[in-house]
Amino acid sequence: MKVIFLKDVKGKGKKGEVKNVPDGYANNFLLKQGLAAEATNSSMKTLEAQKRKEEKDAAAELESAKQLKETLEKLTVELKAKSGEGGRLFGSITSKQIVDAMQKSHKIKLDKRKFEMDDAIRALGYTNVTVKLHPQVTATVKVHVSEQ
């Protein structure tokens, strides 16, 4: 029996795949558990429409990430912090502080977890911070830390 997998089934198939499975397995397990649906003409058309919609959404998401990358790479985030001798900061600048500053000054809202910082910023001056906007798109934001 041909079925369309609605969820991932270990060893049998992934969500969205169409496969031939034994009739008993399909009727007694996959269909009853809601893990798969019978592959009829109408369900195949629905699956194709759903795949096209997902591809369209993914393309739109990628395009918006590319536009945001262009915007981010043009701007500089200004932060002020107290510092001691040699330009060392008292404390550090975290990704949360960078996000808050971007929200305040440039009205750009990002998740702090998208920032890829090995360590927090602990010195005055300019620092380039990588932001992962999409699995295929990463941007570099220039952060300027000046003395308060």
Swiss-Prot record:
Listed Gene3D superfamilies: Ribosomal protein L9, C-terminal domain (3.10.430.100), Ribosomal protein L9, N-terminal domain (3.40.5.10)
UniProt similarity note: Belongs to the bacterial ribosomal protein bL9 family.
Gene Ontology BP terms: translation
Molecular-function GO terms, alphabetical: rRNA binding; structural constituent of ribosome
The organism's place on the tree of life at top rank: Bacteria
Chain's role: Binds to the 23S rRNA.
Keywords: Ribonucleoprotein, Ribosomal protein, RNA-binding, rRNA-binding
GO cellular component, one term: ribonucleoprotein complex
Stated name of the protein: Large ribosomal subunit protein bL9
Segment forming the signal sequence: none
This protein's record includes keyword rRNA-binding: yes
Origin species: Bacillus anthracis
InterPro entries, A to Z: Ribosomal_bL9, Ribosomal_bL9/RNase_H1_N, Ribosomal_bL9_bac/chp, Ribosomal_bL9_C, Ribosomal_bL9_C_sf, Ribosomal_bL9_N, Ribosomal_bL9_N_sf
Transmembrane regions listed in the UniProt entry: none
Ubl conjugation keyword on record: no
HAMAP family hit by this protein: Ribosomal_bL9
